[in-house]
């Protein structure tokens, strides 16, 4: 039974997570704690070459509402409040932005997704109609979370199309392997292992198959949840 529409960001989220989540060429460390009242606090430090960054995020769930606040080292504050709804099998949503000064739409996106127990299809018309993104996820084994994914992004104004395929394979309940390859020749892979309960080590890398003479980019991430 539907309790209402989901968030626009959730359309295509399954495919996006498989193709982007935990892929990194940086050095990252994060630690999370949870209080008995339900407040989750996460501190993250990131190093990318000579650039250092950090942020603190807190999350709180009250009944059917989720609160998320994030503050970074530049004192930028991002907050989000949204209801926790059960998604229906077919979901559609629209995201718009309007500039009252220029009286123009700065953003207009439309998305549709169809979800089944073993697969998910989504289509998003974005950039005010200039881009189309279609994705398909198929879960090979729900018990092990293994899945394959394909994504096609078409930029109408530049006549460019990017195709990305990838997948996730659960070696066991503690270890995951992911890989992806796009039509531009970029290949990425990662190994993720839960050494301690809720504490995860991720080693990832990326290489441009069109320039194999260059060294691959590597990343290391450690996430601790006492």
Curated annotation (Swiss-Prot):
<dbReference type="InterPro" id="IPR023614">
    <property type="entry name" value="Porin_dom_sf"/>
</dbReference>
<protein>
    <recommendedName>
        <fullName>Putative mitochondrial outer membrane protein porin 5</fullName>
    </recommendedName>
</protein>
<dbReference type="GO" id="GO:0008308">
    <property type="term" value="F:voltage-gated monoatomic anion channel activity"/>
</dbReference>
<dbReference type="GO" id="GO:0046930">
    <property type="term" value="C:pore complex"/>
</dbReference>
<keyword id="KW-1134">Transmembrane beta strand</keyword>
<dbReference type="Pfam" id="PF01459">
    <property type="entry name" value="Porin_3"/>
</dbReference>
<keyword id="KW-0406">Ion transport</keyword>
<keyword id="KW-1000">Mitochondrion outer membrane</keyword>
<keyword id="KW-0626">Porin</keyword>
<dbReference type="InterPro" id="IPR001925">
    <property type="entry name" value="Porin_Euk"/>
</dbReference>
<keyword id="KW-0813">Transport</keyword>
<comment type="similarity">
    <text>Belongs to the eukaryotic mitochondrial porin (TC 1.B.8.1) family.</text>
</comment>
<comment type="function">
    <text>Putative channel that allows diffusion of small hydrophilic molecules through membranes.</text>
</comment>
<keyword id="KW-0812">Transmembrane</keyword>
<dbReference type="InterPro" id="IPR027246">
    <property type="entry name" value="Porin_Euk/Tom40"/>
</dbReference>
<keyword id="KW-0472">Membrane</keyword>
<dbReference type="GO" id="GO:0015288">
    <property type="term" value="F:porin activity"/>
</dbReference>
<dbReference type="GO" id="GO:0005741">
    <property type="term" value="C:mitochondrial outer membrane"/>
</dbReference>
<keyword id="KW-0496">Mitochondrion</keyword>
